[in-house]
């Protein structure tokens, strides 16, 4: 390339604007009647605000996301701080317009800021990106996102300059609408894009001439229109994206919508979910292809399930990793555990944190494990408690076996080596080690280590008194 052509190429390049995202998360949420910040109420298995941040991070890097916090600021910061976003503290909550005043120093280096509601978790990255692109194409000072609601009551109405115009004349709040304006179904969603020079060149013109004596971001539309600045609107066809969470009923509705959307996503990826409306599957759950989820299953947290599994009804699985080809029978409860390929668990098994079930192993009905490793091909099929236990491969643990791991002060470990056969109703008092290939007789209480290939018995010798019962009956 010649110097001349290089120069022409450079001069024709349009530099992309520096874009920030500001997330409004300072409010209390009075209508929820809650002791907790509104944005920390959970939908889809995580705080509302966490959903909004995750979406924003698909559009700009976390360093360019500014979460404006106020009410219970430190709790909100602690809940979502690991996401790497920036925080701006609105110490005195004097409205949404005031929040942007407080964020002025943080946002000043940017060309454009997208303002998101911290209580609207269904907004998508695609819609945010379209809104930003529309704002740039229109060369607007302010762009707002709207939607058509069948029942727009309670929302501000968007008043356009004309029916076919993208330009906005005003945003009229519900209480100020005329009878004719109340029939307008196009509502202001609370999502905006601002040109930074226009925003901070005119934000000082906001007033508190309202019932709550606050600065409202919606008033920026009228301020900019008066200043002959261009204010436009983009309507999303997906009205559910802008739903907020001001009431408990709205939180419940959002949770249901997010979970059904998650089920649909998984089914599109090759998972079968029967009666998805009965299942609770959190946003971060991953499931492999050809796995079947039966009705009334809860999959929580960061649970990850492999391919070709079957999760039967009424299981509650939290932060657990499950391999391929695993069958989980009805009624199992699992927390922070790991199940290897081709294992069978349940029915009614309880896996507490730190449980590891090996490849092809069986954990049966009414078996509880905690900080326990069950080796490849081993079985504990009935009525058993295994705590702080390491079990090798090919072990059979008989019905009613208990590891006594707690002495009232400390926990102790039980080790059962490969190929051991533990008879029913055995009591293993930790710390204890059962050597490779040994047998433990049924009903034994084992308090000492057992060498490899041994038989251990720890019970009283059976005594039979013939005729004793007949004599006892004669005494009546």
What spans do the regions from the language model cover?
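Acidic, glycine-rich loop-and-beta core segments that form the ion-binding/anion-interacting portion
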Residues: 281, 286-355, 359
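Structural beta-sheet core signal
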Residues: 21-23, 67, 114-115, 142-145, ...
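Catalytic metal- and UDP-sugar-binding loop of GT-A-like glycosyltransferases, i.e.
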Residues: 43, 116, 456
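Conserved alpha/beta core of the MobA/IspD/sugar-nucleotide pyrophosphorylase nucleotidyltransferase superfamily
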Residues: 17, 185-288
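Glycine-rich hexapeptide-repeat left-handed beta-helix
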Residues: 6, 11, 327-476
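Conserved core of the sugar-phosphate nucleotidyltransferase
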Residues: 74, 83, 123-211, 218, ...
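Glycine-rich N-terminal loop/short-helix segment of MobA-like nucleotidyltransferase
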Residues: 19-43, 59-60, 80
């Amino acid at each position: 390339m010649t110097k001349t052509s290089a120069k022409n190429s450079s001069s024709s390049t349009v530099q992309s604007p520096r874009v920030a995202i500001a997330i409004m998360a300072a409010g209390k949420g009075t209508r929820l009647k809650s002791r907790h910040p509104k944005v920390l109420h959970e939908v889809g298995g995580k705080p509302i605000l966490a959903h909004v941040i995750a979406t924003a991070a698909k559009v700009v890097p976390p360093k360019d996301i500014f979460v404006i916090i106020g009410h219970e600021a430190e709790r909100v910061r602690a809940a979502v701080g690991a996401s790497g976003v920036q925080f701006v503290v609105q110490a005195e909550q004097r409205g949404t317009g005031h929040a942007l005043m407080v964020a002025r120093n943080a946002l000043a280096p940017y060309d454009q800021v997208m303002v998101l509601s911290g209580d609207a978790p269904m907004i998508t990255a695609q819609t945010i990106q379209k809104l930003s692109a529309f704002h740039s194409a229109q060369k607007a000072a302010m762009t707002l996102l709207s939607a058509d609601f069948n029942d727009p009551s309670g929302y501000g109405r968007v008043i356009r300059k004309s029916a076919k115009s993208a330009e906005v004349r005003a945003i009229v709040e519900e209480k100020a609408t005329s009878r004719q304006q109340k029939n307008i179904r196009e509502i202001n969603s609370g999502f905006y894009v601002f040109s930074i020079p226009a925003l901070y060149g005119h934000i000082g013109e906001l007033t508190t001439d309202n019932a709550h004596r606050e600065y409202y971001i919606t008033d920026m539309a009228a301020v900019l229109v008066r200043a002959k600045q261009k204010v436009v609107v983009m309507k999303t066809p997906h009205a559910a994206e802008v739903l907020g969470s001001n009431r408990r009923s709205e939180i419940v509705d959002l949770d249901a919508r997010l979970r059904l959307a998650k089920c649909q996503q998984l089914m599109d990826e090759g998972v079968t979910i029967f009666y998805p409306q009965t299942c609770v599957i959190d946003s971060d759950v991953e499931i492999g292809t050809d796995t079947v989820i039966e009705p009334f299953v809860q999959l929580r947290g960061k649970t990850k399930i492999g391919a070709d599994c079957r999760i039967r009804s009424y299981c509650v699985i939290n932060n657990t990793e499950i391999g391929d080809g695993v069958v989980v029978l009805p009624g199992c409860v699992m927390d922070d555990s790991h199940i290897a390929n081709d294992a069978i668990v349940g029915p009614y098994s309880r896996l507490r944190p730190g449980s590891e079930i090996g490849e092809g192993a069986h954990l049966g009905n009414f078996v509880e494990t905690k900080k326990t490793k069950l080796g490849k091909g081993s079985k504990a099929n009935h009525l058993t408690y295994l705590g702080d236990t390491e079990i090798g491969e090919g072990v059979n643990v008989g019905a009613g076996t208990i590891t006594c791991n707690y002495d009232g002060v400390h926990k102790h470990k039980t080790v059962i080596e490969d190929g051991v056969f533990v008879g029913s109703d055995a009591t293993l008092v930790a710390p204890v080690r059962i050597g490779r290939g040994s047998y433990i007789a049924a009903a034994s209480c084992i308090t000492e280590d057992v060498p490899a290939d041994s038989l251990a018995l720890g019970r009283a010798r059976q005594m039979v008194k013939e005729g004793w019962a007949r004599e006892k009956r004669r005494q009546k």
